[in-house]
């Protein structure tokens, strides 16, 4: 399916046309347009840890996982994935998967890529719901968030470390 968020003006025009076609005079529409506003504003960067070529499938194992970006696992959402390093030569078909031992831990299936361990892949259109749907599954800290404006960048949320995951827990008294 096409996962490109619709332009707001196009979406509103289509909604109003449907409402008008049903004969509703006064109309008020309230909706939460999160993905259409910020979907394309975010990119998840992930490093290729190792490659597992196989007879039937090739797996490109990266350091990001379903806990970092849940949309592919939860909705089978298509996310564009590109290598940030231009590589010459042939590409191969890879499933881009995370290191969490779950069958749903994938970011992209059947992707034509030229990749090597150490490459950084960009998972595109990851701006909506990335952090709000992120979890600490398998004791994985959530990723850092970086705001980029032109040639400037600021860390706006630090990467979680293991101590962050346990700081709100308390032992029971003896």
Regions found by a protein language model. Give the residues of each.
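Alpha-helix-loop-beta-strand connector modules within alpha/beta enzyme cores
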Residues: 11-23
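C-terminal helical cap(s) of enzyme catalytic domains, especially alpha/beta-barrels
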Residues: 3-12, 139-146
């Amino acid at each position: 399916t096409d996962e490109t968020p619709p332009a707001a003006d196009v979406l509103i025009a289509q909604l109003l046309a449907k409402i008008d076609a049903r004969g509703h005079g006064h109309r008020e529409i309230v909706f939460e347009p999160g993905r259409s506003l910020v979907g394309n504003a975010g990119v998840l960067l992930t490093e290729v840890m190792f490659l597992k070529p196989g007879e039937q499938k090739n797996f490109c194992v990266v350091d990001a996982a379903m806990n970092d970006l849940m949309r592919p696992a939860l909705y089978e959402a298509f996310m564009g994935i590109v290598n940030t390093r231009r590589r010459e030569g042939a590409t191969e078909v890879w499933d881009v998967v995370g290191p969490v031992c779950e069958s749903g831990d994938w970011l992209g299936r059947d992707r034509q890529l030229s990749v090597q361990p150490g490459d950084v892949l960009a998972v595109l259109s990851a701006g909506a719901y990335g952090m709000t749907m992120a979890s600490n599954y398998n004791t994985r800290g959530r990723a850092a968030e970086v705001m980029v404006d032109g040639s400037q960048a600021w860390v706006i949320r630090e990467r979680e470390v293991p101590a962050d995951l346990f700081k709100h827990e308390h032992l029971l008294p003896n």
